[in-house]
């Protein structure tokens, strides 16, 4: 399942391909959104990620929230590219140069843009780890809160209500970097350990976003190994 960094990068790609572009055509082939096919002049005015979801905002006051789960996939191609696919097409946006398509996903929700934050899924999400306003202090406060302080880190780091966007590989890398076991609880940690864990959560997640899923510190890797190993092939410390 794509985690926060992969979802954010895909949202970036979609934004570049279709945001505020004139759409030659569009298709909405999931029953939750098929009424949009009857509307003329639809344009994508914004694309963003929130945790593991992508929210596409349209110029008609509607937003489409999609979650790829294990099987959904976005693709972006030139209009001249012939695509062979055995997946079910769910959404297609076509501009004069690019075609963006969502395949196979089933978790697709149509929202009123002004009421996005009232949807139960969005309302219950924790702070987005990749949001610039989510700081190390924000994460530390979550760890020390009554709601989360007595939960094992192995489960907590996958809980989207704690911090949105974390998943299996990020959890493994964060725990390794922090020197902590999955059975450890935030309440077992002292102030320095809370800070180090919070820092690892933020830094490793941002690094994965910036380095296309690679969680290794590139500068540290170069100092340690020079040209002995290919940085691009060794993507994680433990996962």
Predicted features and spans:
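Alpha-helical structural motif
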Residues: 3-6, 10, 19, 118-121, ...
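A cross-family signal for N-terminal binding/gating loops and helix N-caps
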Residues: 1-103, 107-111
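Phosphate/anion-contacting hairpin/loop surfaces
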Residues: 64-165, 170-177
